[in-house]
Amino acid sequence: MLRSSVVRSRATLRPLLRRAYSSHKELKFGVEGRASLLKGVETLAEAVAATLGPKGRNVLIEQPFGPPKITKDGVTVAKSIVLKDKFENMGAKLLQEVASKTNEAAGDGTTSATVLGRAIFTESVKNVAAGCNPMDLRRGSQVAVEKVIEFLSANKKEITTSEEIAQVATISANGDSHVGKLLASAMEKVGKEGVITIREGRTLEDELEVTEGMRFDRGFISPYFITDPKSSKVEFEKPLLLLSEKKISSIQDILPALEISNQSRRPLLIIAEDVDGEALAACILNKLRGQVKVCAVKAPGFGDNRKNTIGDIAVLTGGTVFTEELDLKPEQCTIENLGSCDSITVTKEDTVILNGSGPKEAIQERIEQIKGSIDITTTNSYEKEKLQERLAKLSGGVAVIRVGGASEVEVGEKKDRYDDALNATRAAVEEGILPGGGTALVKASRVLDEVVVDNFDQKLGVDIIRKAITRPAKQIIENAGEEGSVIIGKLIDEYGDDFAKGYDASKSEYTDMLATGIIDPFKVVRSGLVDASGVASLLATTEVAIVDAPEPPAAAGAGGMPGGMPGMPGMM
């Protein structure tokens, strides 16, 4: 059944591919092309910018199934937008890429990055239309961005206390202090480097629990396995686990496990040295067709360390490792050979297994065995380090925050905010914090007076960045119903020397942003600025835009009788 599905899908794909490659193109040059791209950028940025700041608005998004989604998350709004005009849509897609890259690098700051991208591209297009050299504009922009990041790096503050962690999380969760406190509490329980996962709960209240689990540094083999496009994660409840020491290439090796997964209506996680060829194709096909929820992950480590780690996973989940030493092959798999757990989360970089179903006695015995090996190993520091890593993974806890709410829509919106807050908090712990609300970028605009460039066009590139980096703060203020230009002017002219002095849009007052807990992670600000300036200045250097031309309408009716006879289908 699975093999015939593969054959049918190839046959279905061929005409689609032929049509895609044979399509003729439509071109726009120079000013006309950039104007269309700019219109798409403006449309997307307008929708995303509405969500920025403590008084930002919600966005309602139609879903293919179920109720509409309510969100204030910039990257979710950006990804949902598809424009009818293909040239405009191309501009929107490039700005979506800014939001996605920032989300991937820092996990937050996507709305600010989108606002920055629009501001840089808009000003660049104006200057190019006035006759400036686009390459010199780009060079000037790059020099300015480097200077701004250097200034911010010199003025950032390291984060140390639980209160500061809660403040970062609160700001990222759109001012929800409950989210901030719960995340700070989770970090306190499992440590700053500990594993924290966000799940949808089944009660009205949010809950925090520390549970048994393991994380290892290997992510999904293919992005086609992703189940949650917003967070780019694979999330399975009550999955089965197929564990193999060797590479899996043949479809015969995974057919029994796929059949068991299909019959039991449970997702399947495959952990092996590698999964490729027919086996990987079959997994992806089954996932895309909705027949079996499946994900493949490479086993962590190398050599003996990989062998031991996959053995630890087997003990934790109650599964069997398929290995040549025991003459066990995956094609002989039965449900008794498969491990299981409460849930798994797989990202591009790592995998978290929660509450494995292995017997507690076996897990404890394995822990004692590793402890004994650590005591014996006195000379080889590398081996000892690997043993300690294995011990930490088997015996360490995982903090699980279960998000509650009165409806599916409410839970989904809150989960988005928890995800953003967790990412922002990790970024703050990693690289430090800055005054929030766009304040740090506003203050950084003053250092651009010192930038030395080669010519006038490059100076205009610096001016573009000087103007653009005040836009996020201005947008936050305008979303709160205030006059952005006046307040930004006062922050630069009167409070320019006070790095932490900013404007609290929620209370409509000037304040010390660090003291009041309005802060942004340095990593989020840095990633947003670099990604926005990179894509926007490249867009400005575009001279030709090419899209697939619309398909001509199919001819209807018989020859000589346009449209066919009334009430009768056209003859082919």
UniProtKB/Swiss-Prot annotation:
Lineage per the UniProt record: Eukaryota, Fungi, Dikarya, Ascomycota, Saccharomycotina
Modified residues (Phosphothreonine): 102
Domain of life: Eukaryota
Gene: HSP60
Localization, UniProt: Mitochondrion matrix
GO molecular function: ATP binding; ATP hydrolysis activity; ATP-dependent protein folding chaperone; DNA replication origin binding; protein-folding chaperone binding; single-stranded DNA binding; unfolded protein binding
Record's function text: May participate in assembly and/or disassembly of proteins imported into the mitochondrion. HSP60 are ATPases and have affinity for unfolded proteins.
GO biological process, one term: protein refolding
Pfam family, one: Cpn60_TCP1
An annotated GO cellular component: mitochondrial nucleoid
This protein's record includes keyword ATP-binding: yes
Record bears the keyword Signal: no
InterPro entries for the chain: Chaperonin_Cpn60_CS, Cpn60/GroEL, Cpn60/GroEL/TCP-1, GroEL-like_apical_dom_sf, GROEL-like_equatorial_sf, TCP-1-like_intermed_sf
Major localisation: mitochondrion
Stored HAMAP family: CH60
Modified residues (Phosphoserine): 485
Transit peptide limits: 1-25
Keywords recorded for this protein, A-Z: ATP-binding, Chaperone, Mitochondrion, Nucleotide-binding, Phosphoprotein, Stress response, Transit peptide
Protein name: Heat shock protein 60, mitochondrial
Entry's family note: Belongs to the chaperonin (HSP60) family.
